């Protein structure tokens, strides 16, 4: 009627206890974080996930990088959005020479 205690059964029991404690700790921390975020930002909506990759995180169609043009405040030229950083580095370094 008494269960025999072996090294394997004790080790398994300790392992299960530690594993359960770790899982419960992670779940409780995440629950607290989620509740705090919900209190701080009650109207926040989750981001939209599009598996095809054609929509951005707000659920709108992605815009091609080359379609966005930004006017440089230094020289006044229209520069493509994906080249703006490189243009700005060159544009600002021209005055130092």
Curated annotation (Swiss-Prot):
Zn finger region (SGF11-type): 70-91
GO terms of biological process kind: chromatin organization
Principal subcellular localization: nucleus
Subcellular location: Nucleus
Source domain of life: Eukaryota
Coiled-coil boundaries: none
GO cellular component: DUBm complex; SAGA complex
Keywords, in A-Z order: Activator, Chromatin regulator, Metal-binding, Nucleus, Transcription, Transcription regulation, Zinc, Zinc-finger
MF annotations from Gene Ontology: transcription coactivator activity; zinc ion binding
Functional description taken from the UniProt entry: Functions as a component of the transcription regulatory histone acetylation (HAT) complex SAGA. At the promoters, SAGA is required for recruitment of the basal transcription machinery. It influences RNA polymerase II transcriptional activity through different activities such as TBP interaction and promoter selectivity, interaction with transcription activators, and chromatin modification through histone acetylation and deubiquitination. SAGA acetylates nucleosomal histone H3 to some extent (to form H3K9ac, H3K14ac, H3K18ac and H3K23ac).
Domain notes: The long N-terminal helix forms part of the 'assembly lobe' of the SAGA deubiquitination module. The C-terminal SGF11-type zinc-finger domain together with the C-terminal catalytic domain of UBP8 forms the 'catalytic lobe' of the SAGA deubiquitination module.
Family the UniProt entry places it in: Belongs to the SGF11 family.
Subunit structure: Component of the 1.8 MDa SAGA transcription coactivator-HAT complex. SAGA is built of 5 distinct domains with specialized functions. Within the SAGA complex, SUS1, SGF11, SGF73 and UBP8 form an additional subcomplex of SAGA called the DUB module (deubiquitination module). Interacts directly with SGF73, SUS1 and UBP8.
Name of the protein described by the UniProt record: SAGA-associated factor 11
Protein's organism: Kluyveromyces lactis (strain ATCC 8585 / CBS 2359 / DSM 70799 / NBRC 1267 / NRRL Y-1140 / WM37)
């Amino acid at each position: 009627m008494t269960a025999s205690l072996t090294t394997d059964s004790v080790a398994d029991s300790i392992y299960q206890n530690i594993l359960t404690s770790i899982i419960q700790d992670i779940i409780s921390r995440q629950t607290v974080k989620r509740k705090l975020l919900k209190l701080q930002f009650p109207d926040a909506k989750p981001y939209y996930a599009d598996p095809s990759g054609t929509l951005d995180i707000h659920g709108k169609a992605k815009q091609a990088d080359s379609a966005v043009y930004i006017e440089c405040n230094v020289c006044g030229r229209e520069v493509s959005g994906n080249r703006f950083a490189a243009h700005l580095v060159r544009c600002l370094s021209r005055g130092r020479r």
